[in-house]
Amino acid sequence: MPSKQYRVDRLAQEIQKDVDEILLKRVRDPRVQNVTITGVDVTGDLQQATIYYSILSDLASDAEKAQAGLDKATGLIRSELGARLNIFKTPEIKFVRDPSVAYGSRIDQLINDLHKKEK
C-alpha cells in the first residue's frame, strides 16, 4: 500500500508543473511574466496548497506587483487546476514569495565581498 506522503508529494509536483504552465500560457497579466514557481507544499488532507515563487527583480515594488498579479489570477489558476487534476476537491491555493532565493543571493554577495577583501 503506497504511503499517504507519496500521494501528497506527487500532487505537489503535479501542481507545480501545471501552475507553471498556466502562468506561461493562460495568465496574460504582465505583472506575473517574470515569476518562477520554485516549490509547492500541500497539506496532508490535500485541502490547501502553498505555492512558492521567485521573481528576477530584487525591487520591493516588483515583488508587490507580482504578488498582486498572482492574487488576482488565483481564481483562474485554481479553476484550471481543477480541470487538470484528477482529485475530488481542488485545493485552496496561496502564493508566497520564496525566501530561499533572496537568502542565497545574500550568501553569494557576502562570499564575493570576502573575496574582494582578500585581494
From Swiss-Prot:
Family under the similarity heading: Belongs to the RbfA family.
GO MF annotations in UniProt: ribosomal small subunit binding
General function of this protein: One of several proteins that assist in the late maturation steps of the functional core of the 30S ribosomal subunit. Associates with free 30S ribosomal subunits (but not with 30S subunits that are part of 70S ribosomes or polysomes). Required for efficient processing of 16S rRNA. May interact with the 5'-terminal helix region of 16S rRNA.
Signal peptide range in chain numbering: none
Gene3D superfamilies from the UniProt entry: 3.30.300.20
GO cellular component, one term: cytosol
One of the GO biological process terms: maturation of SSU-rRNA
UniProt main location, coarse: cytoplasm
Subunit structure as annotated in this protein's UniProt entry: Monomer. Binds 30S ribosomal subunits, but not 50S ribosomal subunits or 70S ribosomes.
Taxonomic lineage: Bacteria, Bacillati, Bacillota, Bacilli, Lactobacillales
Top-rank lineage group of the source organism: Bacteria
HAMAP family listed in its UniProt record: RbfA (MF_00003)
Pfam annotation, one family: RBFA
InterPro entries for the chain: KH_dom-like_a/b, RbfA, RbfA_dom_sf, Ribosome-bd_factorA_CS
Protein name as catalogued: Ribosome-binding factor A
Cellular compartment(s): Cytoplasm
